[in-house]
């Protein structure tokens, strides 16, 4: 095995010391110089004597004359500077393949640029046009006669417009935009100053007499029904997507805010609820009507459980809340009413007491008991056997 390892290492060293002239290792700089001389039309005098000698030794350059090379060698021996030979090339064409005597572009006779008719300096134009595809006497753009710019009708200064339009695709007498007659801006009907509107509209896509937005008649803003100041609303709504008479939010009729039923001021509530997810007639926090704090919503104490608890604490119950009837989970607590403060304990009834539902910490389930017991057993086993 040792002999094999020594043999492998020795072989690697021998290959590394192998001569470089056996064709395996190539001088890249020489190859680059060879390619540059052989495959480019290069002036031999500009390369220097070394490159010329290399070209003579490695092969003839493309497009070179052997007689010229011999002449160059004789001239160099005589100490004279060789003159560069012109490469053999096809007849050079002028910029832009054109008709008779044209310097650039596909044009007709006497055209300096572009596909134009006679006497055109630039662009595809008719006679006497300086630029663009225009009719007679047009300075720029695809226009009708006498147009300075743009695709316009006669006498238009800019844009695709009808007669007498200064800018935009408009009808006669329109200063800007795609509008009807007499419109200053936008795609509008007659007499509209801005936007796509009906007659007499100052802005937006609106019906007659609307100042802004996509609205019905008499709407100041937004996509609304008649007489709505803002938002997508029904008639008489000031804001939001609401039913009639709603000030804000997605609500039913007469709702001021939020997704609510009729008469709800806020939140997702039933009818007549001011806040929270309470039932009907609940003011806040989901409390049942007339119940004190911590009553778990509208859940009333069970009468049977209250009676059983009263029997246990009858002797000690007073005007203060008793402890909760349970140590975990949901229980009940009681206290005397003010008018029953002086009653004897044995005379107390449920009508003499105030009751409340109390919630203690959640009771541990059977899974928790088993897991805790199992954990304790494992700890004891580890302690005993270690």
UniProtKB/Swiss-Prot annotation:
**The UniProt record lists the keyword Transit peptide:** no
- Fill in the PTM field for this protein: During host cell invasion, proteolytically cleaved at the cell membrane in the region I by a papain-like cysteine protease of parasite origin. Cleavage is triggered by the sporozoite contact with highly sulfated heparan sulfate proteoglycans (HSPGs) present on the host hepatocyte cell surface. Cleavage exposes the TSP type-1 (TSR) domain and is required for productive invasion of host hepatocytes but not for adhesion to the host cell membrane. Cleavage is dispensable for sporozoite development in the oocyst, motility and for traversal of host and vector cells. O-glycosylated; maybe by POFUT2.
Composition-biased stretches, type Low complexity, lie in: 293-303
Q: What segment(s) does the record annotate as region Required for the binding to heparan sulfate proteoglycans (HSPGs) on the surface of host hepatocytes?
A: 80-88
| Residues listed as glycosylation sites in the UniProt record | 327
Query: How does this protein lie in the membrane?
Result: Lipid-anchor; GPI-anchor
Lipid attachment locations (GPI-anchor amidated cysteine): 363
Q: Which GO terms describe its cellular component?
A: cell surface; cytoplasm; plasma membrane; side of membrane
Swiss-Prot/TrEMBL sequence repeat ranges: 96-104, 105-113, 114-122, 123-131, 132-140, 141-149, 150-158, 159-167, 168-176, 177-185, 186-194, 195-203, 204-212, 213-221, 222-230, 231-239, 240-248, 249-257, 258-266, 267-275
Question: Region Region I: what ranges?
Answer: 91-95
Q: Where is the TSP type-1 domain?
A: 312-364
The Gly residues compositionally biased stretches are 275-292
Which Gene3D superfamilies does the record cross-reference, listed alphabetically?
Answer: Thrombospondin type-1 (TSP1) repeat (2.20.100.10)
Propeptide stretches in the record = 364-386
Keyword entries, A-Z: Cell membrane, Cytoplasm, Disulfide bond, Glycoprotein, GPI-anchor, Lipoprotein, Malaria, Membrane, Repeat, Signal, Sporozoite
The record's subcellular location field reads: Cell membrane; Cytoplasm
Segments carrying the region annotation (Disordered) are 51-304
Q: Which SUPFAM superfamilies match?
A: TSP-1 type 1 repeat (SSF82895)
Q: Which PROSITE patterns match?
A: TSP1 (PS50092)
Q: Which SMART domains match?
A: TSP1
* Segments of skewed composition (Basic and acidic residues): 72-100
Domain remark in the UniProt entry: The N-terminus is involved in the initial binding to heparan sulfate proteoglycans (HSPGs) on the surface of host hepatocytes. The N-terminus masks the TSP type-1 (TSR) domain which maintains the sporozoites in a migratory state, enabling them to complete their journey to the salivary gland in the mosquito vector and then to the host liver. The unmasking of the TSP type-1 (TSR) domain when the sporozoite interacts with the host hepatocyte also protects sporozoites from host antibodies. The TSP type-1 (TSR) domain is required for sporozoite development and invasion. CSP has two conformational states, an adhesive conformation in which the TSP type-1 (TSR) domain is exposed and a nonadhesive conformation in which the TSR is masked by the N-terminus. TSR-exposed conformation occurs during sporozoite development in the oocyst in the mosquito vector and during host hepatocyte invasion. TSR-masked conformation occurs during sporozoite migration through the hemolymph to salivary glands in the mosquito vector and in the host dermis.
Homology family: Belongs to the plasmodium circumsporozoite protein family.
Protein name per the record: Circumsporozoite protein
- The species is Plasmodium simium
| Lineage start | Eukaryota, Sar, Alveolata, Apicomplexa, Aconoidasida
